UniProtKB/Swiss-Prot annotation:
Binds 1 FMN per subunit. The lineage of its organism: Bacteria, Bacillati, Actinomycetota, Actinomycetes, Mycobacteriales. Belongs to the nitroreductase family. Optimum pH is 7.5 to 9.0. Keywords: Flavoprotein, FMN, NAD, NADP, Nucleotide-binding, Oxidoreductase. Its EC number is 1.-.-.-. The keyword Cell membrane does not apply. Homodimer. This is Nitroreductase NfnB. InterPro entries: Nitroreductase, Nitroreductase-like, Nitroreductase/BluB. Potentially helps in the design of second generation BTZ and DNB drugs that are less susceptible to nitroreduction.
């Protein structure tokens, strides 16, 4: 198979396409039930496999779940959540996000729940929305991203690069997505349902076609300015 090559210098078309692609990708939290054709899915995941990694190790193992298997997994996750059977491969603790990180997180939550019409003291509605997230926000597909059992920060970095590459590939094909860390809070449940052994669950990515009528999909979260995150030195 021939490998496509890029122009040796920057081109207006390529730069504009990159900007549209990167800025056009967003987390979608309401999906239509229409499935993505299998041929399209295979093309997207093949493209994502070209993501870079340390020494070309390609540590990702991806389980793409659809149809009846998707429905069984969703119900298993909802049950595990109701029974408080939390099993996390990569520990999460309160206070993980501090300072400006917590400020950005709080701003995101305020915007999201305002769009949903949920107040912070409406615990029943908040729990109901958590349940909806465990059903992949109605997406007909979910990709579970597993890493080797010995995964540490360096390998996790490769997994993040793959995840972003995958979501950009989806965006290019008109497919909406939502990366979900919550799905990894029930790692044992996911492994049991999918028959996966000796791998750690890092995250899930729900995907399908966006429901553009849902108010939650109209939420736009601002990004930090360049000066807040990046320094140029000479």
């Amino acid at each position: 198979m021939s490998v496509p090559t890029l122009p040796t210098g920057p081109t207006v078309d390529l730069a504009q396409a990159a900007e549209r692609l990167i800025k056009g990708r967003r987390a979608v939290r309401a999906f239509r039930p229409d499935e993505v054709p299998e041929e399209t899915m295979r093309a997207v995941f093949e493209l994502a496999g070209h993501a870079p990694s340390n020494s070309n190790t390609q540590p990702w193992h991806v389980e793409v779940v659809s149809g009846a298997a998707r429905d069984r997994l969703a119900e298993a996750l909802v049950t595990a959540h109701a029974e408080e059977r939390v099993t996390v491969d990569f520990p999460y603790r309160e206070g993980l996000f501090q300072g400006v990180l917590q400020e950005r997180r709080a701003d995101f939550g305020s915007r999201l729940y305002a769009a949903l019409g949920i107040a912070r003291d409406q615990t029943d509605l908040l729990q109901g929305y958590n349940t909806e997230s465990l059903r992949f926000y109605g997406a007909p597909h979910v990709a579970m991203l597993f890493a080797p059992n010995n995964t540490e920060a360096r390998i996790a970095g490769d997994m993040g690069i793959y995840a972003q590459t995958l979501m950009l590939a989806m965006t290019a094909h008109g497919i909406a997505s939502c990366p979900q860390a919550l799905l990894s809070f029930y790692a044992d449940t996911v492994r049991a349902e999918l028959g996966v052994e000796n791998r750690k669950l890092l995250m899930g990515i729900s995907f399908g076609y966006a429901d553009d009528t849902a108010a939650v999909n109209g939420v736009r979260i601002p990004r930090a300015g360049l000066s807040e995150t990046t320094r140029f030195s000479r």
